[in-house]
């Protein structure tokens, strides 16, 4: 059955700390193009790779990868809350085949997800329930992280599994590109923050609002040039997009985790979701990128990208 791809950056600052209207118009046009692409493809199933930002997955048990057979959106930053429309049978099929391929992946019957999943689904298909979904969490913030080669192997295994589902499958990757938002690092965090990173579930409304306001303030400071976080790196972003477009994803295997941080900020690891999605596409054979959008948007603390791709019949 046919497969297709849409990868996108997300930002909780969209609508809260916006750039110039011309930039918003460009982003809106790119998303409209992506929505049209997806509507024309008419997926039966979305397999979405996304990170978490200490809203659903914590250091009390931090897997590198996790497939959800059921998932609940926590509704942070005003995103839609409630259960995702998860295709449980498909999730089990994908998990079995990924494990059989030698990639160790965790499995959840009660996954909690945040804006990394919810914002992508809302922007691309209208809601978190519009299309049956298999959510796949990829740890992209909580060190230690495995090598990026394992992410590619995960994606390839998911792609092979999807080929056996007898469904039109859209692979979505949500995250990145270069960015360094104020996400605490466990090794250097104060004790009280470490406790929140270990198990910060069910925050009060006041706690969540305060946390979100810190990120909004950081975005405003970053856009004003007074923040201490790492700068965006458009050159790095475009190089990544070029590699993914080329189909030679194995090039990324040599990129070390330290190099990601040095070049593109701590949260550049979120591009693991793009790598997994493109690797899943590659499992079906050659692919062709049909659109690529990129803008450097400091107000959203993001090198912001959107891409779409289809399989090439050989």
UniProtKB/Swiss-Prot annotation:
It catalyses: 3-(2,3-dihydroxyphenyl)propanoate + O2 = (2Z,4E)-2-hydroxy-6-oxonona-2,4-dienedioate + H(+); (2E)-3-(2,3-dihydroxyphenyl)prop-2-enoate + O2 = (2Z,4E,7E)-2-hydroxy-6-oxonona-2,4,7-trienedioate + H(+). Pathway: Aromatic compound metabolism; 3-phenylpropanoate degradation. Gene3D superfamilies: LigB-like (3.40.830.10). The active site is at residues 115, 179. Pfam families: LigB. It comes from the Bacteria. Homotetramer. This is 2,3-dihydroxyphenylpropionate/2,3-dihydroxicinnamic acid 1,2-dioxygenase. It comes from Rhodococcus jostii (strain RHA1). The gene is mhpB.
């Amino acid at each position: 059955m046919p497969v297709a791809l849409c990868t996108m950056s997300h930002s909780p600052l969209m609508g809260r700390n916006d750039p110039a209207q011309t930039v918003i118009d460009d982003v809106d046009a790119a998303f409209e193009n992506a929505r049209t692409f997806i509507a024309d493809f008419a997926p039966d199933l979305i397999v979405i790779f996304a990170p978490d930002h200490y809203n659903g997955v914590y250091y009390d048990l931090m897997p590198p990868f996790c497939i959800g057979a059921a998932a609940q959106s926590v509704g942070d930053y005003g995103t839609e809350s409630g259960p995702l429309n998860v295709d449980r049978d498909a999730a089990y099929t994908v998990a079995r085949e990924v494990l059989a391929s030698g990639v160790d992946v965790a499995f959840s019957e009660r996954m909690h997800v945040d804006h990394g999943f919810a914002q992508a689904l809302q922007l691309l298909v209208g809601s978190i329930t519009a299309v049956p979904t298999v959510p796949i969490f990829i740890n992209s913030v909580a060190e230690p992280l495995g090598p990026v080669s394992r992410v590619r192997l995960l994606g390839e295994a998911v792609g092979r599994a999807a080929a056996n589902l007898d469904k039109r499958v859209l692979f979505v990757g949500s995250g990145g590109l270069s960015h360094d938002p104020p996400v605490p690092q466990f090794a250097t965090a104060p004790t009280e923050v470490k406790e929140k990173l270990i198990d910060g579930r069910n925050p009060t409304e006041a706690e969540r609002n305060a946390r979100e306001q810190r990120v909004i303030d950081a975005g405003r400071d970053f856009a004003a040039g007074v923040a201490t976080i790492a700068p965006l790196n458009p050159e790095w972003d475009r190089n990544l997009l070029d590699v993914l477009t080329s189909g030679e994803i194995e090039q990324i295997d040599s990129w070390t985790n330290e190099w990601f941080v040095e070049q593109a900020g701590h949260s550049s690891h979120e591009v693991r979701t793009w790598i997994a999605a493109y690797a899943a596409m590659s499992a079906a054979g050659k692919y062709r990128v049909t659109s690529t959008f990129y803008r450097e948007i400091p107000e959203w603390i993001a090198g912001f990208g959107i891409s779409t791709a289809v399989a090439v019949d050989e």
